Regions:
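Repetitive helical segments and hydrophobic/amphipathic motifs
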Residues: 11-14
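Long terminal segments
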Residues: 2-6, 17-38, 43-46, 53, ...
């Protein structure tokens, strides 16, 4: 279950155009994954999933969910969260964090991660740390 959550985390946090090569880091500066040409890799370089037209799949092709504008849905079509500007909320409207100047902050303002070369459409790491209850 934790592996599935980790894969889902990587799939959802790195949503952007295929032209970008992106890297995501945890609060300690360790790389947790990268996105390249529509494919997502974990920290060891293993392929874990892909993004096609706003839809997210794991490495086996299993559909995990999608984005539609600033809203994010799980595979059943249930809204799981949304963003407004640089602030992220769960499906109930509870504030869970923000993204600013390449850094990701939790709801208390504590920096929990960072990213590089990520365009503005990226889904915040903080949103997924909260959603998937990862440390």
């Amino acid at each position: 279950m934790k592996q599935l959550r980790y894969i889902a985390l990587l799939i959802f946090i790195i949503t952007a155009c295929a032209a970008y090569s992106q890297r995501m880091y945890d609060r300690c500066g360790s790389m947790i994954g990268r996105y390249e040409n529509g494919r997502i890799y974990d920290r060891t370089g293993c392929y874990v999933g892909r993004i096609e037209s706003g839809r997210f799949y794991d490495h086996t092709g299993w559909y995990l969910g999608c984005e539609n504008g600033d809203r994010y849905y799980d595979r059943s079509g249930t809204l799981v969260g949304y963003c407004s500007g640089k602030r992220y909320y769960d499906r109930t409207g509870y504030y869970i964090g923000s993204v600013e100047n390449g850094y990701v902050y939790d709801r208390t303002g504590t920096r929990i991660g960072q990213y590089s070369k990520v365009p503005s459409q990226v889904v915040a790491l903080v949103y997924l740390f909260e959603l998937f209850e990862l440390p």
